[in-house]
Regions:
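Acidic donor-binding segment of Leloir-type glycosyltransferases
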Residues: 71-94
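A short, N-terminal amphipathic alpha-helix
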Residues: 54-70
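N-terminal nucleotide-binding beta1-loop-alpha1 segment
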Residues: 2-41
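Conserved donor-nucleotide/metal-binding helix-loop-beta segment in metal-dependent transferases, i.e.
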Residues: 131-158
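Short beta-strand-to-loop acidic/aromatic patch adjacent to the donor-nucleotide binding site
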Residues: 119-127
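Short phosphate-binding loop-to-helix
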Residues: 86-120, 177
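Conserved alpha/beta core of the MobA/IspD/sugar-nucleotide pyrophosphorylase nucleotidyltransferase superfamily
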Residues: 4-18, 180-229
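Short acidic/His/Gly/Ser-rich catalytic and metal-binding motifs that mark active-site loops
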Residues: 34-40, 84-86, 161-162
Length: 229
């Protein structure tokens, strides 16, 4: 079973200043309260296993974003003290979420990114078992010196949710997470006159249902909860 303990600061986590030259891209990772996390997996995982899985996913996502060569800074927006400690230990900047709701929290983090000089933001949920620094850099590679706003979306495997969202400039469109957010973000991009790029790849799989968990087993590997067959 994945240990929920918070790791020490890894020695090989690159400093954000080592990101490649170019537009300043800030990754934003929202992490909700750990209480009741992944409740939709309650049929196959007990509360402790869901907590372990959530911490494992948060740790993996934050570390991948910090290691991505095209990401200048990683912000983790969360109401949870444990997650803020985890984020800081991994080299990200934790932000306390004061408003309830995913879009409200992301809006606050976006303001922080803009205040820090971000040219673009990349929003990454933590429930992506195939996340890696390479997958993040592949999305970031869509960011050049656009003559007009740019929106790049990785929809979920059903084509409904948004598993990754790059926006340049950071406030080019509103945030529409929840429900059929992929369609909503595409519509927002069209309304803003933004260039739209829809990507596939490993980040199309997210962990919402028991079926998703089975599909993710090869990626979770030895870190998966012990009772998941």
């Amino acid at each position: 079973m994945i240990s929920p303990s918070i790791p020490a600061m890894p020695h090989d986590v690159p400093d954000a200043t080592t990101a490649q030259a170019g537009p300043r891209l800030v990754a934003i990772i929202p992490v909700g309260a750990l209480d009741g996390a992944k409740s939709r997996l309650g049929a196959v995982l007990d509360a402790e296993e869901r907590l372990d899985l959530t911490l494992h996913l948060a740790r993996t996502t934050i570390a991948a974003a910090v290691a991505a060569g095209r990401v200048a800074e990683v912000l983790v927006i969360t109401p949870d003290d444990t997650v803020r400690v985890l984020a800081a230990n991994l080299g990200a900047r934790p932000i306390r979420q004061r408003d309830s709701g995913l879009n409200q929290g992301l809006a606050a983090a976006r303001e922080e990114a803009i205040a820090g000089g971000a040219d673009a933001i990349l929003i990454l949920p933590i429930d992506l078992p195939d996340v890696s620094s390479d997958a993040i850099d592949e999305i970031a590679a869509t960011l050049g010196e656009p003559q007009r706003p740019l929106v790049a979306i990785v929809p979920d495997r059903h084509g409904r949710g948004t598993n990754a969202l790059l926006i340049a400039p950071p406030d080019a469109i509103g945030l529409c997470f929840g429900g059929s957010s992929s369609t909503a973000h595409e519509a927002a991009a069209a309304a803003a006159g933004a260039r739209l790029i829809v990507l596939g790849g490993p980040l199309a799989l997210d962990l919402d249902t028991p079926e998703d968990l089975l599909l993710a087993e090869p990626s979770l590997g030895r870190g998966r909860p012990a009772d998941v067959a």
